[in-house]
Curated annotation (Swiss-Prot):
This is Serine/threonine-protein kinase D. It is an enzyme of class 2 (transferase). Residues 9-271 form the Protein kinase domain. PROSITE patterns: PROTEIN_KINASE_ATP (PS00107), PROTEIN_KINASE_DOM (PS50011), PROTEIN_KINASE_ST (PS00108), SH3B (PS51781). The gene is spkD. It catalyses: L-seryl-[protein] + ATP = O-phospho-L-seryl-[protein] + ADP + H(+); L-threonyl-[protein] + ATP = O-phospho-L-threonyl-[protein] + ADP + H(+). PANTHER family: SERINE/THREONINE PROTEIN KINASE (PTHR24363), SERINE_THREONINE KINASE LIKE DOMAIN CONTAINING 1 (PTHR24363:SF0). The lineage of its organism: Bacteria, Bacillati, Cyanobacteriota, Cyanophyceae, Synechococcales. ATP binds at L15, G16, S17, G18, G19, F20, G21, D22, T23, K40.
């Protein structure tokens, strides 16, 4: 586009336009790397109102300084490099976050959604601790950064809200516009009464979008409670995540989580206790291990009966047949009992193994989620530590630079003073030679005392300066034997005494 802002930022392309202004991708041409930045150009929404530009300027600078502080101390909020105004337009120059928005990657899995939600809640905890409400959370305003895959929260609504400032007849200032995106705004937000749970409401709907790739208006809702029917659009929904989201998107603020911290704790406490219970197992009666043995040992042998000899063969045949049948039945019953016992035991064993496997998988997933959370928090802590170290290093380097600059300035002042004295001495000497003086004042450049008599006991009658002309009139010694000259001082026109070591012939 080859358009520049402040003769510094070269516009690369437009990133979007809205009711409050325009957003551009630009290059910072005044640094060697020509780093990419995002420039937001904002315009007052009520150009013809009674609200003064000075008031909007003041509100803009206040909110911009808050945004600068947030980005400086949290790596998941873009840094604010600069802010300024020009021709009744207001500019923010921010860090360019390279990555993809949640709008672009949807739909995602429940596990991915939980990780993103946990990380964003950590960021919101920090933002809310500063008394700030984002006001415009939606999929487009959350970027998964390429460098570390952490979700970055962009486009805070507070600065844009200042563009709608108007002054009431009572003298108080309010915003005449509502910041937010239709479908993601909580009911209280449309009336200008945003609270911390307003952000949680929008975050819940944003996570629903990442799971379904559907806007809130595309879901049917319960006519009595207003609850959205979104879970039927997710093929495999995590029950823990669903429970947390449903509470966050309650219509009444009092029914939602009171804070990002509360929602974060709910998400992780449910995950910690969220191992699926084993499915109810069918009760199967299994014979005790010794039942088959009891059945065999309790089988009665044929009873001995005395019969007439003539019928002995028939009796034997009948009894023997019955005994064989009884034995066969006993064996069959035993086999059936053992088989039933083995089958039932196999079913129970399988169900126990399956339950144990499910519990182990749930525990593994919980540990992985916790590990991801810890790693994300460690990265945040490392980034914050690195930022603090860089800031300390910058402050120390700046202190050393200022000290070195002060020392150079001091040396320069001393050099100039010495140079001035040297020039003055040369000038005095030239003047003395021109006047026909027989001698000049010598010694280190500066003033010298001319006294009323030969010695330091006498008072000072005037002062001469190195290089000024003298005429020698007489000489004498003081009480210590030091030689003094009585001189006529051309500079003052006075006659007095000066120590011999201060006279050059």
């Amino acid at each position: 586009m080859n358009v520049q802002v402040l003769d510094r930022y070269e516009i690369v392309k437009s990133l979007g336009s809205g009711g409050f202004g325009d957003t551009f991708l630009a290059k910072d041409t005044q640094i060697p790397s020509q780093k990419l930045v995002v420039i937001k150009r904002l315009k007052p929404a009520n150009a013809n109102s009674n609200t003064s530009t000075e008031l909007i300027q003041k509100l803009f600078e206040k909110e911009a300084s808050v945004l600068e502080d947030l980005g400086e101390h949290n790596s998941q909020i873009p840094k604010l490099y600069s802010y300024f105004s020009n021709d009744n337009e207001f500019y923010l120059v921010q860090e360019y976050i390279q990555g993809v928005s949640l709008n672009e990657i949807a739909p995602i899995s429940s596990e991915q959604a939980k990780t993103i939600l946990s990380s964003l809640l950590t960021t919101l905890k920090y933002i809310h601790s500063k008394g700030i409400i984002h006001r415009d959370i939606k999929p487009e305003n959350i970027i998964l950064r390429d460098s570390d895959h952490l979700p970055v929260l962009i486009d805070f609504g507070a600065v844009k809200e200042t563009m709608g400032a108007v002054t009431l007849g009572s003298g108080s200032t309010v915003s005449s516009v509502v910041i937010g995106t239709r479908g993601f705004m909580a009911p209280e937000q449309s009336s200008g009464r945003s609270v911390f749970s307003t952000d949680l409401y929008a975050l819940g709907l944003t996570i629903i979008y990442t799971l379904t790739k559907k806007l809130p208006v595309e879901f049917s809702s319960d006519q009595q409670t207003g609850q959205l029917d979104w879970q039927s659009h997710v093929s495999k929904i995590d029950s823990v995540l669903a429970k947390v989201i449903n509470k966050a998107i309650e219509m009444e603020p009092s029914r939602r989580y009171s804070s990002a911290e509360a929602m974060y704790q709910a998400l992780h406490s449910l995950i910690s206790s969220g191992a699926e219970p084993a499915l109810p197992m069918e009760t199967v009666r299994v014979a005790p291990s010794n039942e088959f043995l009891v059945t065999r040992s309790s089988t009665k042998t044929a009873e001995t009966v005395v019969k007439p000899v003539g019928n002995s063969h028939n009796n034997y045949s009948n009894n023997n047949g019955k005994s064989k049948i009884a034995t066969l039945l006993t064996v069959l019953i035993g086999i059936i009992v053992v088989t039933a016992g083995l089958g039932g035991g196999f079913i129970i064993t399988q169900q126990i193994k399956e339950a144990e496997a499910r519990a182990a998988q749930a525990e593994k997933e919980k540990q992985e989620a916790e590990q991801k959370r810890i790693e994300a928090e460690q990265k945040i802590a490392e980034n914050e530590k690195r930022q603090r170290e860089l800031e300390q290093k910058r402050v120390e380097e700046e202190r050393q630079r200022l000290a070195a600059e002060a020392e150079r300035a001091k040396q320069e002042r001393q050099r100039l003073a010495a140079e001035r004295q040297r020039v003055q001495v040369l000038a005095n000497q030239a003047k003395a030679m021109a006047s026909g003086a027989s001698a000049t004042i010598g010694g280190i450049p500066g003033s010298k005392n001319i006294r009323s008599g030969p010695g330091t006991d006498y008072g000072v009658i005037t002062q001469g300066y190195t290089g000024e002309g003298l005429d020698i009139l007489d000489s004498s010694t003081d009480s210590s034997g030091h030689v003094w000259y009585k001189v006529y001082h051309y500079g003052s026109g006075s006659t007095g005494w000066i120590a011999s070591q201060l006279v050059n012939f």
